[in-house]
UniProtKB/Swiss-Prot annotation:
Keywords: ATP-binding, Cytoplasm, Nucleotide-binding. ATP binds at residues 8-10, 38, 117-122, 131-133. It is found in: Cytoplasm. Induction: Cotranscribed along with teaABC. GO terms for cellular component: cytoplasm. It comes from Halomonas elongata (strain ATCC 33173 / DSM 2581 / NBRC 15536 / NCIMB 2198 / 1H9). This is TRAP-T-associated universal stress protein TeaD. GO terms for molecular function: ATP binding.
Length: 147
């Protein structure tokens, strides 16, 4: 059924739920589990057009990447604690726009399913579906399960 399941993580409660669901599906299917954490790199153009908050510009990319790596490693550790064999789970960190990076990663790695949290770290609780989950669901080449 599924050979490669991808779970994007960002440290949010929604991502934890998605990881747990992804682990359950991995255990049912024996699929490989790919965990991806995307850190957002802010371009000079975005900065000059004031598309980002000033405090976001103060965080260097290395610090963002380190933080994303920590989140990805914690998610991988949690997946193995929940019973995924170590040789069946891999963690990745990429820089870029989250929705676009998730969709590209899923296509490049030939994922059969993306399991994503409905709300991420920037989630507005009043919204039914977060913008990243909505964009991924609308543009991924494979089925997307929103948890």
């Amino acid at each position: 059924m599924f050979n490669r399941i991808m779970v994007p993580v960002d440290g949010s409660k929604g991502a934890v739920k998605a990881l747990e669901k992804g682990v359950g599906l991995q255990q049912l299917t024996g699929a490989e589990l790919y965990i991806l954490c995307v850190f957002k790199h802010h371009s000079l153009l975005e900065a000059s057009l004031s598309m980002v908050r000033p405090e976001q510009l103060d965080i260097p990319d290395d610090a963002l990447k380190d933080y994303a790596t920590e989140i990805a490693v914690q998610a991988k550790t949690r997946a193995t604690e929940l019973g995924v064999p170590a040789d069946k789970v891999r963690a990745f960190v990429k820089g870029g726009r989250p929705s676009r990076t998730i969709v590209r990663f899923a296509r490049k790695r030939e994922c059969d399913l993306v399991v994503i949290g409905a709300q991420g770290t920037n989630g507005d609780k009043s919204l039914l579906l977060g913008s990243v989950a909505q964009r991924v669901a609308g543009s991924a080449h494979c089925p997307v399960l929103v948890v």
